Amino acid sequence: MAVKKIVQIGHEALKKVSEPVKDVNEVKGLIQDLKDTLATVEGIGLAAPQIAVNKRVVYINFGDGENEYVLINPEVTGVSKETYEDYEGCLSYVMHEGLVERPRAVRIQALNEKGELKVYEAQDLLARCFLHEIDHLEGIMYVDRAKEMYELVEK
């Protein structure tokens, strides 16, 4: 489809709770837009609100050939009691990062591109990525959860 502009912090789409997808066929183009857009930037995840579409769709791709996920209407169904802090960044708030505490492990369920219900269990970076992107669907950015924020400088 097309590479879309990634909206930045303060944009209305990033503040809204996104609408559930009723039919996966209605978001095929959106999914391709997310894939095309993420391929052009240095990031591992992109949620539909980040391209100004308030639908509950997330695309994650670690670029390793193994960790690629399309999540439609994702729901967190379980989290570990153990948490840890790590730094997060966001394509919608470039040149910044923040220290965020998140559960070490998570279980989510979501529809895939074919409309099949899948359950995923993840730890560490993948769990953090799932939660970060699902937050976007709730109108939450990592800066809302960060204990500390830093502005990055270019070399």
UniProtKB/Swiss-Prot annotation:
Removes the formyl group from the N-terminal Met of newly synthesized proteins. Requires at least a dipeptide for an efficient rate of reaction. N-terminal L-methionine is a prerequisite for activity but the enzyme has broad specificity at other positions. InterPro entries: Peptide_deformylase, Peptide_deformylase_sf. One of its GO terms (biological process) is co-translational protein modification. Binds 1 Fe(2+) ion. Its cofactor is Fe(2+). This is Peptide deformylase 2. NCBIfam families: pept_deformyl (TIGR00079), PRK00150.1-3 (NF001159). The active site is at residue 133. The keyword Signal does not apply. The gene is def2. Its EC number is 3.5.1.88.
